[in-house]
Amino acid sequence: MLTSILIKGRTPVLASRNLLAALSNCNHITWAVSRRLYNDGNRDQRNFGRNQRNNNSNRYRNSRFNSRPRTRSREDDDEVHFDKTTFSKLIHVPKEDNSKEVTLDSLLEEGVLDKEIHKAITRMEFPGLTPVQQKTIKPILSSEDHDVIARAKTGTGKTFAFLIPIFQHLINTKFDSQYMVKAVIVAPTRDLALQIEAEVKKIHDMNYGLKKYACVSLVGGTDFRAAMNKMNKLRPNIVIATPGRLIDVLEKYSNKFFRFVDYKVLDEADRLLEIGFRDDLETISGILNEKNSKSADNIKTLLFSATLDDKVQKLANNIMNKKECLFLDTVDKNEPEAHERIDQSVVISEKFANSIFAAVEHIKKQIKERDSNYKAIIFAPTVKFTSFLCSILKNEFKKDLPILEFHGKITQNKRTSLVKRFKKDESGILVCTDVGARGMDFPNVHEVLQIGVPSELANYIHRIGRTARSGKEGSSVLFICKDELPFVRELEDAKNIVIAKQEKYEPSEEIKSEVLEAVTEEPEDISDIVISLISSYRSCIKEYRFSERRILPEIASTYGVLLNDPQLKIPVSRRFLDKLGLSRSPIGKAMFEIRDYSSRDGNNKSYDYDDDSEISFRGNKNYNNRSQNRDYDDEPFRRSNNNRRSFSRSNDKNNYSSRNSNIY
């Protein structure tokens, strides 16, 4: 049978199955079979230079919705379909073949684990290996001739599922290249990378004999020279890094530290791709393979991901070196994706602003019932709204328990300090954006509260996954207005998550007065906060099937409610309204009061919101992550002309060519 294929994304040719099989064994970076089925025009020709990695010009920009992934059905999420034309070496391990109960003791008896790592993990007094750990540790260590892809829910112990095999490998090779990096772990965010480093230190603390296998984190927002001094001093065997900083180090010091890498781990691979790191990950893999002293295909790759869509599969095919790749699926298709131990509920108000009152009243009740022994995380849609909520909660509850603000605009040192503090505290409230939604492991969180909807459907699952960790129970409360109810239906349709507990809420005059007294922001600041929310929600309209004419005016009405005058509208200039594409829309007139001036209160702050402001709309995935001032991988910000936020209008009225950094 003849099959049409593409070599290096160029001219189609006809080939037999034998030729296809031969091509599949070629170097994946050099030969790309059927690559153009998934990629944009010029991405097939790889180049390790940064200019090529930053080339993102061929992405579609005509509609803000073109770049948004379609909502997947429940059947799509349950059954992972691999395209054999691009991933022919995959071996799908049936769940029934990998369902035998595994314990640390059994792994020790079988000779899979050394007594030193067994001692360290046992001293942590875990109740037992989690299902993810049971299904992955032994297959990872059983052979050096295959890579591994593992699909697992959030909060299921993925970190130790790859740390235990890494330490076992270091023990097995302790006399080989003792002072070289042997394992590289790539994480999507600084905070997750530092958290993985903290887990490594726990293993060190439980068995001092393992401290000789040193670990160093390489993340943005920290001093590069200090990190290199630490690398020279410790000569680590394990490096945990974010992609941008890792590439910086590899380009300068790959020969010095990274010639003996045996393991490469991608944690939260789907999130890495979601943020825009695909080219960086392929570059990292290419450099590590090229510099490896043993062979270009020596490195074993472990890829952990909550979802395995076409993009994740494509990445796996491009970066995995071994002849075989095991796929281990630890997700039961009969279970919903949200953790089964989480008690979920939704509180529905008439107005968006009432969700703020409802959340404050709920927290007051919990503090009273728990005698101030209350630990919760509150998620908010944008940075400005997060800061606003934190201010209100501090004015309300600072005498009862600590209130912490956490988002990407905070410096890395402060973020690290906040994470350590909240992990240690028995009580407190962490107010954050989605930067804290994935991978962060905070112990003993009683509740996750959400005011408004997340930027993406999957983030609801990752948000609530911050509670009910390590076998404990927890609860989640979603505070929304009636116009946000389509989000709840979308959760049920697309993710099989049914929130049975639903209650309506109407604030009393007492709680409204109490909260409004805690509002200290000026009207201009309130308008900025509400406009950031409008930006957020406008980007979600199509995905969640919101009614634009209802949801946007409802969000805008929050301005008047917070200023204790429901009739007030947000004052903006006509020029600003033009930028939003709403100057002739009835919706714009319902939301804003047009004032023809460009400055206020005698200062330089303008209602026009110039191009360097943070009012571009969120949700556009067509951005180049390496050139943005981002809150994930965090090398020092390099401003360039293409980094300016553009309000270019299209027929869709919502086409913005850069991503809103205000949401994280």
UniProtKB/Swiss-Prot annotation:
Chain positions of motif Q motif: 106-134
Binding site for ATP: A152, K153, T154, G155, T156, G157, K158, T159
Any GO molecular function: RNA helicase activity
Biased composition (Basic and acidic residues): 628-638
Region described as Disordered: 42-79, 602-664
Compositionally skewed regions (Polar residues) per UniProt: 653-664
EC code(s) of this entry: 3.6.4.13
Additional observations: Present with 10300 molecules/cell in log phase SD medium.
Domain remark in the UniProt entry: The Q motif is unique to and characteristic of the DEAD box family of RNA helicases and controls ATP binding and hydrolysis.
Name of the featured protein: ATP-dependent RNA helicase MSS116, mitochondrial
